[in-house]
């Protein structure tokens, strides 16, 4: 039977495995997030590679430990690379994470491309509440790429997406993880209200899920990444109250996380059991 203590043990194991294996993560991400995402992965113990050229996509995906696809600022060439890499990952049993940034009717082209990527069965779909709810077929008004829906509202609408992925991760004031692996919703608490005010934190979180998916199941990967960010955000907020200092200290704690901090600060709950 799944328990919070058992899940925390698995998060610690996933973190230890990532430090030992330094997984190579191919990131096809947006122009705003690329640098920050790479730094988060390096600080976490993974090895990022920002390969988004369609002529190199297949060969590089084949040697990668995991793949992260983020639709934040898609170009036609990037879209080609995404389709090639997602298909290659599926054919070679390489875990991959889909972050449907800005999904919805206002940004119709990228949304159509997101729908097409679902055929390649991502290991994890990660997004904010509005993105996940809209992707699941609900009509939600977003504010650009930012969410206008709370994460606790969205997780109840997201079950349909488990037909397309092993795990759904919804970020917000609290984070929620739905999975085909366990019959409960996992709630992750912690973090800081300053996190969403730093550009690319959500995008980097998706890439961190991909890094963890190289060493753990999709559910534990999503949980580990969210716990990693939640602890770093909580501890950084204890020391900094302004955005500049918070951003720097947050990255420090992304790097300084260890088993003791996970055991001490991981705040997770198991919610309603799926019918």
UniProtKB/Swiss-Prot annotation:
Protein name: Hydroxyethylthiazole kinase
Pathway: Cofactor biosynthesis; thiamine diphosphate biosynthesis; 4-methyl-5-(2-phosphoethyl)-thiazole from 5-(2-hydroxyethyl)-4-methylthiazole: step 1/1
Keyword rRNA-binding listed: no
Lineage start: Bacteria, Pseudomonadati, Pseudomonadota, Gammaproteobacteria, Moraxellales
Family designation: Belongs to the Thz kinase family.
Gene3D superfamilies linked: 3.40.1190.20
UniProt xrefs under InterPro entries: Hyethyz_kinase, Ribokinase-like
GO process annotations (BP): thiamine biosynthetic process; thiamine diphosphate biosynthetic process
Residues at which ATP binds: 126, 171
Cofactor(s) required, per the database record: Mg(2+)
Gene name of the record: thiM
GO molecular function: ATP binding; hydroxyethylthiazole kinase activity; magnesium ion binding
Record keywords: ATP-binding, Kinase, Magnesium, Metal-binding, Nucleotide-binding, Thiamine biosynthesis, Transferase
EC number: 2.7.1.50
Catalyses which reaction(s): 5-(2-hydroxyethyl)-4-methylthiazole + ATP = 4-methyl-5-(2-phosphooxyethyl)-thiazole + ADP + H(+)
Known role: Catalyzes the phosphorylation of the hydroxyl group of 4-methyl-5-beta-hydroxyethylthiazole (THZ).
Binding site for substrate: 50, 200
